[in-house]
Amino acid sequence: MRALITGGAGFVGSWLVRELLARGTDVLVLDDLSTGRYENLEEVEDGRRVELVVDTVNDPGIVNECVKQVDLVFHLASAVGVRLIIDQPVRTIESIVGGTDVVLRACARYRRPVLITSTSEVYGKGSRIPFSEGDDRIMGATTKRRWSYACAKALDEFLALAHWYESRLPVVIARLFNTVGPRQTGQYGMVVPTF
């Protein structure tokens, strides 16, 4: 078994690399190292079990080449951090939605099951606790740049579910909530590692 992890040199992705290796799965990592770090993979690097491709998920040629070599895909690559989202909203939207579109098309082409990571931000301003995936969502004004991230991730979910609906591409969506832990950096505006 071999898995592709986009964003596999990032904070969450590097932990997934370790877990899959522990379960006997070989791993291909695709990461542009814009927020991921090579150091996150140094201690697990083994040419027979882990391969790192330094490139972007926005390149269909690269993504297709990676996807056809694996049995399943974990799509974690994304714009990261409040600072980037506020300072570069165009880059945020284009990289999130564009990258996910490229990954989903490649997975559909080669019939590879895919897990798409989303965010708790897609719940928006909902007042109901606990959150429910079936609840209606209330987002902030489009003039508030912070909502571009939540809306882009929601569009990722719509794209993934559309691929399931149209072609029965096996898709799982995981909404991550405020992840923290070793190897996380405060460099991109994350609060906990800053303290």
Segments the model singles out, each with a brief description of its role:
Residues M1-T179:
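N-terminal Rossmann-like NAD(P)+-binding domain of SDR-like oxidoreductases, especially those catalyzing
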Residues V192-F195:
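Short, intrinsically disordered, charge-balanced linker/junction segments flanking boundaries
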